[in-house]
């Protein structure tokens, strides 16, 4: 059972990003409970790399619960270039948020990690016990170590103060309100933008890399529903992987084909193998999640891709790109 319900003020950092917008939608569509007040904030409300601004935000909101999504993020090529920036900014953000939550007496914090935190050299499938078993992939070590430190801090806050600070580890998230920037975005939104442009220009589609790497994609609206479950019901300090099953892993080539199909693209598709593939796979086990929620139903991948492509086309002018 989760902790007792009652009046709650839930602060969501990174509230205007991909996952924050998905949680907003799911709450607005009926997932919110009586007695819950949801407060979504973005970098416009406070610079969370600044301790004083973060403290002021927490003093003002006085959250009983926090979903911590705010982070400096970017795709593979941006990470390779700016490892120091990713390390410093994220360490500052995370320390400021967790300590401000502690100072105002927040009852529970759920932070968002990433599967890139896992050791580069590992056995598959990855599970929650393996986080600290070796160094992460060298391409984005700054971001990965900063995210790992959230787990270290959560354990320390529990050991020293008894705080219920925990974290979730989603696999590759995609959906409406993603960053569709081709240079800086993640693989699926980048593909969606590329297909849109190729279709508009009547040109060929070039996919970066060989198309062979495999990923577990999770639709942002499914992840939002799981985040709300974690907030209410999951009381371990140890993190939990939020992912589709291993059998639902798809190759980048298959992902590209799903986007091509969803957008009715009829042009030529080529793969540029001179571009880096990143990690070949990072298959994660969702065994722990399934032990808690054996009947949770994920949106089928092709349907989720179709909905995301439709959102991007309908909101092309406003979309982050």
Curated annotation (Swiss-Prot):
<feature type="binding site">
    <location>
        <position position="186"/>
    </location>
    <ligand>
        <name>NADP(+)</name>
    </ligand>
</feature>
<dbReference type="InterPro" id="IPR036291">
    <property type="entry name" value="NAD(P)-bd_dom_sf"/>
</dbReference>
<keyword id="KW-0511">Multifunctional enzyme</keyword>
<feature type="binding site">
    <location>
        <position position="208"/>
    </location>
    <ligand>
        <name>substrate</name>
    </ligand>
</feature>
<keyword id="KW-0560">Oxidoreductase</keyword>
<keyword id="KW-0521">NADP</keyword>
<feature type="site" description="Important for catalytic activity">
    <location>
        <position position="116"/>
    </location>
</feature>
<comment type="subunit">
    <text>Homodimer.</text>
</comment>
<feature type="site" description="Important for catalytic activity">
    <location>
        <position position="114"/>
    </location>
</feature>
<feature type="binding site">
    <location>
        <position position="277"/>
    </location>
    <ligand>
        <name>substrate</name>
    </ligand>
</feature>
<protein>
    <recommendedName>
        <fullName>GDP-L-fucose synthase</fullName>
        <ecNumber>1.1.1.271</ecNumber>
    </recommendedName>
</protein>
<dbReference type="GO" id="GO:0016853">
    <property type="term" value="F:isomerase activity"/>
</dbReference>
<feature type="active site" description="Proton donor/acceptor">
    <location>
        <position position="143"/>
    </location>
</feature>
<feature type="binding site">
    <location>
        <position position="147"/>
    </location>
    <ligand>
        <name>NADP(+)</name>
    </ligand>
</feature>
<comment type="pathway">
    <text>Nucleotide-sugar biosynthesis; GDP-L-fucose biosynthesis via de novo pathway; GDP-L-fucose from GDP-alpha-D-mannose: step 2/2.</text>
</comment>
<comment type="similarity">
    <text>Belongs to the NAD(P)-dependent epimerase/dehydratase family. Fucose synthase subfamily.</text>
</comment>
<dbReference type="InterPro" id="IPR028614">
    <property type="entry name" value="GDP_fucose/colitose_synth"/>
</dbReference>
<feature type="binding site">
    <location>
        <position position="194"/>
    </location>
    <ligand>
        <name>substrate</name>
    </ligand>
</feature>
<dbReference type="InterPro" id="IPR001509">
    <property type="entry name" value="Epimerase_deHydtase"/>
</dbReference>
<dbReference type="GO" id="GO:0042351">
    <property type="term" value="P:'de novo' GDP-L-fucose biosynthetic process"/>
</dbReference>
<feature type="binding site">
    <location>
        <begin position="170"/>
        <end position="173"/>
    </location>
    <ligand>
        <name>NADP(+)</name>
    </ligand>
</feature>
<comment type="function">
    <text>Catalyzes the two-step NADP-dependent conversion of GDP-4-dehydro-6-deoxy-D-mannose to GDP-fucose, involving an epimerase and a reductase reaction.</text>
</comment>
<dbReference type="GO" id="GO:0010595">
    <property type="term" value="P:positive regulation of endothelial cell migration"/>
</dbReference>
<feature type="binding site">
    <location>
        <begin position="14"/>
        <end position="20"/>
    </location>
    <ligand>
        <name>NADP(+)</name>
    </ligand>
</feature>
<feature type="site" description="Lowers pKa of active site Tyr">
    <location>
        <position position="147"/>
    </location>
</feature>
<dbReference type="GO" id="GO:0050577">
    <property type="term" value="F:GDP-L-fucose synthase activity"/>
</dbReference>
<dbReference type="Pfam" id="PF01370">
    <property type="entry name" value="Epimerase"/>
</dbReference>
<dbReference type="GO" id="GO:1904906">
    <property type="term" value="P:positive regulation of endothelial cell-matrix adhesion via fibronectin"/>
</dbReference>
<feature type="binding site">
    <location>
        <position position="215"/>
    </location>
    <ligand>
        <name>substrate</name>
    </ligand>
</feature>
<keyword id="KW-0413">Isomerase</keyword>
């Amino acid at each position: 059972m989760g902790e007792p319900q009652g009046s709650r003020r839930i602060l969501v950092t990174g509230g205007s990003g991909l996952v924050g917008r998905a949680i907003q939608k799911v709450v607005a569509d009926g997932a919110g409970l009586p007695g819950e007040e949801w407060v979504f904030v973005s970098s416009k409300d406070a610079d969370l790399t600044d301790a004083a601004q973060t403290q002021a935000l927490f003093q003002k909101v006085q959250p009983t619960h926090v979903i911590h999504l705010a982070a400096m993020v970017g795709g593979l090529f941006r990470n390779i270039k700016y490892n120091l920036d990713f390390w410093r900014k994220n360490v500052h953000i995370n320390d400021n948020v967790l300590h401000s939550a502690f100072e105002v007496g927040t009852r529970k914090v759920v932070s968002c990690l990433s599967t890139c935190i896992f050791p580069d050299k590992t056995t598959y499938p990855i599970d929650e016990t393996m986080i600290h078993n070796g160094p992460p992939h060298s391409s984005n070590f700054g971001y990965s170590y900063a995210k790992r430190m959230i787990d270290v801090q959560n354990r320390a806050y529990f050991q020293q103060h008894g705080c219920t600070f925990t974290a979730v580890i989603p696999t590759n998230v995609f959906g409406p309100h993603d960053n569709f920037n081709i240079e800086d975005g993640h693989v699926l939104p980048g593909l969606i933008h590329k297909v849109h442009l190729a279709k508009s220009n009547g040109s060929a589609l070039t996919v970066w890399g060989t198309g062979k790497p495999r990923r577990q994609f999770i639709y942002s609206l499914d992840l939002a529903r799981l985040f709300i479950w974690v907030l209410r019901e999951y009381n371990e300090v140890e993190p939990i992987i939020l992912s589709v099953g291993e059998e639902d892993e798809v190759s980048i080539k298959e992902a590209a084909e799903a986007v091509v199909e969803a957008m009715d693209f009829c042009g030529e598709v080529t793969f540029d193998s001179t571009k880096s593939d990143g990690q070949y796979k990072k298959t994660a086990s969702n065994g722990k999640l399934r032990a808690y929620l054996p009947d949770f139903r994920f949106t089928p991948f092709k349907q989720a891709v179709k909905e995301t492509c439709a959102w991007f086309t309908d909101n092309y002018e406003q979309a982050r790109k």
